[in-house]
Amino acid sequence: MATLQSLADLNRSNTGAVDPANEAPVHVQKLDAQGRAYATGKRKDAVARVWIKPGNGTVTINKRPVETYFARPVLRMILRQPLEIAGRVDQYDITVTVAGGGLSGQAGAVRHGLSKALTYYEPELRAPLKREGFLTRDARVVERKKYGRKKARRSFQFSKR
């Protein structure tokens, strides 16, 4: 901040100019050469790479339809949540490659990546998705096993006599 030497300096500093550091960030659309939005999502050990483009709602996961990859309806519901919050069901074609972890972690990773990709395609969706917590990386991972114990916290069986 500049030092004020006179009343004129004070008047110049109070002209209403806004400090750029205090302004709200402006989010712009981020698309690749094919007009797709790309984002990565993570959950536990799973990492999902998600591409979205305008279409009729086709969801492909690891080159397979979503109905065959996520056979359990609960996992498909997790995947659909960001689209329902945004009101964009069946408006985007979604292509996903996901690796690592189990099916539940992979579904959470796809949801995280899809939420981020939606905000890259339509920045005005950031507020409702952030309010629901879909843009936040779930940091909970498996606690490591400790030596001298059977698992992370479980002790070996103890016999008194």
Curated annotation (Swiss-Prot):
**Per its UniProt record, what InterPro entries does this chain match?**
Ribosomal_Su5_D2-typ_SF, Ribosomal_uS9, Ribosomal_uS9_bac/plastid, Ribosomal_uS9_CS, Ribsml_uS5_D2-typ_fold_subgr
Where would one find the signal peptide in this protein?
none
Question: In Gene Ontology terms, what is a biological process of this protein?
Answer: translation
Instruction: Kindly give the Pfam families that the UniProt entry links to this protein.
Output: Ribosomal_S9 (PF00380)
Keyword terms, alphabetized: Ribonucleoprotein, Ribosomal protein
- What does the record give under GO molecular function? RNA binding; structural constituent of ribosome
Please verify whether the record's keywords include Kinase. no
Annotated GO CC locations: cytosolic small ribosomal subunit
Q: Which family does it belong to?
A: Belongs to the universal ribosomal protein uS9 family.
PANTHER family under this entry? RIBOSOMAL PROTEIN S9, SMALL RIBOSOMAL SUBUNIT PROTEIN US9M
Q: What protein am I looking at?
A: Small ribosomal subunit protein uS9
Q: Which organism is it from?
A: Methylobacterium radiotolerans (strain ATCC 27329 / DSM 1819 / JCM 2831 / NBRC 15690 / NCIMB 10815 / 0-1)
| Lineage of producing organism | Bacteria, Pseudomonadati, Pseudomonadota, Alphaproteobacteria, Hyphomicrobiales
What gene is this protein a product of? rpsI
